[in-house]
Regions:
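Metal-dependent amide/peptide-bond hydrolase catalytic core
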Residues: 1-179
Length: 179
């Protein structure tokens, strides 16, 4: 409008916050990604609202707690006069932390792969979401990413290789029988 200096830009505040949030990423430990942002009504109007979504990746549950504390603190200390911030958590997956018996389970799976003449996978721990994290959270060992093979997960280019399903099932059955 006529007096832009009287406005408080919610988008400017969001931009400052997003820059600060993403600068705190330490890949392999704790990382943040702003995957969506929306605000304002037009180029000639000081935006009075803005919202954005942050994805958080962590390998341990304590890192998630650190992330939430950091985000809450950031939200409580806005830097653009006349703006405010509210934070809403829209979902949570616990980290898939190592539990007793996980190494043994992986060894059984690797032996099953070897017996079937399949490549022997190496166990890796990475951040991200997995339904198995709810199982490991209560102390039950579990392995992740043992389903059908493919690529492009969660994208328009995602695909599965149907012929891999039988091989994957054989490896899982052999592992179960070895327990």
């Amino acid at each position: 409008g006529k007096e832009p200096q009287k406005g408080a830009s919610a988008i400017l505040q969001a931009a400052r916050m997003i820059t600060e949030i993403e600068s705190r990423s330490v890949f392999g430990y704790l990382s943040f990604n702003c995957g969506r942002i929306s605000g304002g009504t037009g180029a000639n109007v000081i935006p009075d609202s803005c919202e954005f979504s942050i994805g958080i990746r962590y390998a341990a549950n304590v890192q998630y707690e650190e992330a939430i504390a950091f985000l809450k603190n950031l939200c409580e200390h806005v830097t653009v006069p006349g703006t405010s911030c509210t934070m809403e958590q829209n979902g949570y997956y616990p980290a898939m932390e190592m539990v007793d018996g996980a190494d043994r389970l992986l060894s059984l799976y690797q032996e099953s792969c070897k017996l079937l003449g399949e490549p022997i996978p190496q166990g890796i721990q990475q951040s991200g979401c997995s339904d198995t994290s709810f199982v490991t959270r209560i102390g039950i060992p579990a392995l992740c990413s043992l389903g059908i093979q493919g690529a492009g997960a969660h994208s328009l280019d995602e695909y599965a290789i149907p012929s891999s399903l039988l091989v994957q099932c054989k490896k899982l059955v052999a592992t179960i029988l070895a327990m």
